[in-house]
UniProtKB/Swiss-Prot annotation:
PANTHER family, A to Z: 39S RIBOSOMAL PROTEIN L20 (PTHR10986)
GO biological process: ribosomal large subunit assembly; translation
Name of the protein in its database record: Large ribosomal subunit protein bL20
SUPFAM superfamilies reported for this sequence: Ribosomal protein L20 (SSF74731)
Family: Belongs to the bacterial ribosomal protein bL20 family.
Pfam families, sorted: Ribosomal_L20 (PF00453)
Cellular component GO terms held in the UniProt record: ribonucleoprotein complex; ribosome
InterPro entries, per database record: Ribosomal_bL20, RIBOSOMAL_L20_CS, Ribosomal_protein_bL20_C
Gene3D superfamilies reported for this sequence: 6.10.160.10, Ribosomal protein L20
Swiss-Prot/TrEMBL keywords: Ribonucleoprotein, Ribosomal protein, RNA-binding, rRNA-binding
Gene: rplT
General function of this protein: Binds directly to 23S ribosomal RNA and is necessary for the in vitro assembly process of the 50S ribosomal subunit. It is not involved in the protein synthesizing functions of that subunit.
PROSITE patterns cross-referenced by the UniProt entry: RIBOSOMAL_L20 (PS00937)
């Protein structure tokens, strides 16, 4: 029985890896060893980046909410506390979007949070405005 040669599989494997490494600078796109190291490291960076993306967006949403809340005389922490007291269950992503795209609706929510902080009864039915809603 003839000896099995790995040359076809090995070449295919190397070609596949070098294809993944296209666009890398220096030896990292031509040398198999360096390309292999860089492709692996790129995977690590991508994994970490996916986790960081979540943190970065949360921080951005908080900054936007804070800026909008301060326009209505509340700090971010007091605004969020007021929302909890008022019984609002809106996440930061929705609040940030509201603050950017519909400031008057955010103002209505901020007024409800302010009322809850001051101990006034909270209106359960609030019209947030907007056409066709």
């Amino acid at each position: 029985m003839a000896r099995a040669s790995r040359s076809i599989h090995a070449r295919k494997k190397r070609r596949k890896l070098l294809k993944e490494a296209r666009g890398y600078r220096g030896t990292k796109h031509t040398s198999y060893k360096r390309a292999k190291e860089q492709v692996w490291k790129s995977g690590v960076y991508a994994y970490v980046g996916r986790k960081q993306k979540k943190r970065d967006f949360r921080a951005l949403w908080i900054q936007r909410i804070n800026a909008a809340a301060r326009r209505h005389g509340l700090s971010y922490s007091r605004f969020v506390h007021g929302l909890r007291l008022a019984g609002f269950d809106l996440d930061r992503k929705v609040l940030a979007d509201l603050a950017v795209s519909e400031p008057e609706a955010f103002g209505a929510v901020a007024a409800q949070a302010k009322n809850a902080l001051e101990g006034r009864p909270v209106e359960r039915r609030v019209e947030l405005g907007g056409a066709g809603r």
